[in-house]
């Protein structure tokens, strides 16, 4: 790997010769492949991982793989049964389980593509609400897709800049800021990041990162947690920024209990508790994380919450599709189900933010029908008996995921039918007798026409 000379000089000075040589060798190695199981969907199964190469030690659901299978052609990936994620990013699971033990309102500020958001949602106590935000429109749509595949109803996805949150009137117990960075930790995966690197870019990122934290700081409750992370190695974006947050905003830095044999590196400039993942030393890509607490001042509460709207006739015909207590909101023909416990938060958010997903998208009104949405198919709140189900094999599942026409058994009821693979919901079709209309979202479809002759999947499921 041909690293920029300035990067070598700067990083060697920071790390010292021995640690830098470990990093340099690690960057030449093949990146480890890891997945994280979705406990919302796999907890009732015995899960076998044929390519397993050990557990990710800081995350119970994380598993290393011996090699990288072709994930695209595994229907269980599309069902949300697991997520392909770099192992270091799963460290968030440990942080949250050590510090969050009651229901909270959390914001993942720079959330796309959604890996850390789904880690957070799995670790959050029941009754918590997760806001996942991404400023870039295209990336926000990817984030919304992954949140919907994960399948938890207590999530909102927004497409806003951090400063926009200051006008909402919502205070957060936890803010995760995985801030945009110079990307040194991605050198091994993305050679384009090497070409874009410069010390000038590092300085720009450092300034932007602190601006982001200053923008969102008023939205963090007194006593609330800020989890600051980057995917870079340099101290300017890491230790120096954390120390600036401590000095300027009077934050308290908090330790995370870790094991020595995980080979996580601490701060490279002082003895404050910070956590750095270095390829070659830790089995991961580059990651830096620190946990800070906002000083406790006078209590700040979210504004008075709005009452849920009354149910109209359309809603009364579909509320049996979900288990739980929901408020139903109709907008331009689209029906959303918002858990009533946090409908007030939703009502504040939708007035001031660009909300692109919230709760469960039930479907779209078309004539007398509500065409059920993919969000509904994949959500754990969907009632087992809400729709007729048809179990399909792998070949048919891949055809469905390509949005191709598929054949159903002759005794399949007419109307909307939920297709399942290994009993995991994949999505809806509308059976009209002589054919079934494929309702899989066009933008989610598998675009490759390749059909693998043999593909070892990441996981297999067996009933308990």
Which residues does each PLM region occupy?
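Helix-to-beta-strand junctions that scaffold the AdoMet/dcAdoMet cofactor pocket
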Residues: 125, 220-222
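S-adenosyl-L-methionine
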Residues: 133-170, 177
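Class I S-adenosyl-L-methionine
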Residues: 172, 225-228, 232-344
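Conserved AdoMet
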Residues: 31-90
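Mobile active-site "lid"/loop adjacent to the S-adenosyl-L-methionine
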Residues: 138, 173-214, 231-238
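Conserved SAM-binding loop of SAM-dependent methyltransferases across substrates and taxa
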Residues: 113-126
């Amino acid at each position: 790997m041909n690293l920029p000379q300035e990067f070598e000089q700067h990083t060697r000075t920071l790390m010292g010769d021995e640690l830098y040589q470990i990093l340099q060798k690690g960057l030449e190695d093949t990146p480890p492949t890891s997945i994280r199981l979705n406990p919302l969907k796999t907890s009732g199964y015995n899960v076998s991982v044929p390519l397993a190469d050990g557990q990710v030690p800081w995350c119970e659901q994380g598993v290393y793989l011996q090699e990288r299978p072709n994930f695209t052609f595994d229907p269980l990936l599309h069902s949300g049964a697991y997520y392909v994620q770099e192992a270091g990013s799963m460290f968030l699971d440990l942080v949250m389980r050590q510090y969050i033990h009651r229901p909270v309102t959390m914001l993942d500020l720079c959330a796309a593509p959604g890996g850390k958001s789904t880690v957070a949602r799995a670790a959050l106590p029941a009754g918590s609400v997760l806001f996942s935000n991404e400023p870039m429109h295209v990336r926000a749509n990817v984030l919304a897709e992954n949140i919907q595949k994960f399948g938890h109803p207590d999530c909102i996805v927004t497409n806003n800049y951090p400063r926009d949150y200051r006008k909402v009137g919502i205070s957060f117990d936890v803010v995760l800021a995985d801030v945009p960075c110079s990307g040194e930790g991605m050198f091994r995966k993305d050679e384009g990041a090497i070409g874009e690197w410069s010390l000038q870019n590092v300085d720009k990122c450092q300034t932007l990162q602190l601006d982001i934290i200053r923008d969102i700081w008023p939205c963090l409750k007194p006593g609330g947690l800020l989890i600051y992370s980057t995917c870079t190695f340099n101290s300017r974006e890491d230790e120096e920024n954390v120390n600036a947050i401590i000095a300027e905003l009077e934050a308290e830095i908090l330790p995370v209990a870790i094991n020595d044999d995980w080979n996580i590196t601490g701060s490279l400039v002082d003895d404050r508790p910070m956590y750095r993942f270095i390829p070659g030393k830790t089995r991961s890509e580059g990651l830096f994380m620190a946990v800070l607490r906002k000083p406790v001042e006078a209590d700040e509460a979210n504004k008075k919450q709005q009452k849920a709207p009354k149910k109209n006739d359309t809603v009364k015909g579909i509320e049996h599709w979900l288990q739980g207590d929901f408020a139903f909101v109709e907008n331009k023909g689209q029906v959303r189900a918002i858990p009533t416990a946090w409908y007030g938060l939703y009502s504040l958010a939708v007035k001031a933010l660009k909300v692109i997903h919230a709760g469960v998208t039930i479907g779209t009104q078309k004539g007398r029908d509500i065409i059920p949405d993919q969000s509904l198919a994949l959500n754990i709140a969907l009632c087992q008996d809400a729709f007729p189900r048809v179990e399909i094999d792998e070949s048919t599942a891949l055809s469905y995921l390509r949005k191709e026409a598929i054949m159903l058994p002759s005794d399949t009821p007419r109307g909307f039918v939920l297709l399942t693979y290994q009993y995991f919901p994949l999505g809806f079709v509308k059976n009209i007798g002589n054919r079934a209309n494929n309702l899989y979202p066009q933008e989610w479809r598998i675009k490759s026409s390749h059909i693998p002759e043999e593909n070892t999947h990441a996981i297999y499921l067996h009933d308990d």
